[in-house]
Amino acid sequence: MNLNIKVRGQGKALVFLHGWGFDHKVWLNLVDALEQKYTLYLVDLPGFGLSPLMDWPHFKTDLLKHLPAHFAVVGWSMGGLFASRLALEIPERTTHLFNVASSPRFIKEENWPGVEPLVFDNFLRNLVTNPQQTISEFVGLQLQNQNYEYRDQILPDPVSLEAGLTILADWDLREQLYHFKKPTTYLFGRLDAITPRATMAVMQKNYPSFNYIMFSKAAHMPFLSHKEEFLTILESLLK
């Protein structure tokens, strides 16, 4: 069984990778504005939506079979880890890396902002004991009253959810990013309860060549809460 990828539009390739607990439908609100200029690849990440659970090598191989020689990639939250790793491993095919409410390392460490390890461990424990309630609360935290209907999403099974959390806990791409030379942008929401705004200050110091944008009134989903501003930024940086 292969990855579920929806392809829309025409023009330069633009790959969208969603966050934990969601699937490709989270991006549908942007399609009408972009499909006249770009070919959009809306990907269900492994274990989410209609894509089967698979490891990184299989995901990468399957995805690249569907993509043209060159593409820009947009990753939101956990999808930013996938987007970054893809760009880091095949920079010759990546034109732009564009991460939203994401971080190369999600867990808090000394001199690095992120999710407290204890909070993360408790979340994982709750997911095992009560997956439905746990993911509902997590989705509510991300949406924060945004105009978005989660009921259309396919609820992932607990194994897939736990696999995604393992990626969030274990992947650390900070060192590799030091050597990444392609155009890169990180967007943050000042009100984000998941990816702390302090991440931006640390990244600006460590990766001064990247572009950074802070949405002062956005939380974890600026592409929904500030759609027009997000689209303007995206298109201006892709020119």
List where the protein language model places each region.
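Conserved acidic catalytic loop of the alpha/beta-hydrolase fold
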Residues: 57-71
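Short beta-strand/loop motif that positions the catalytic acidic residue
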Residues: 180, 186-188, 192
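Conserved HGGG/HGGXW glycine-rich cap/lid loop of the alpha/beta-hydrolase fold
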Residues: 4-52
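Conserved alpha/beta-hydrolase catalytic His-Asp/Glu region
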Residues: 128-178
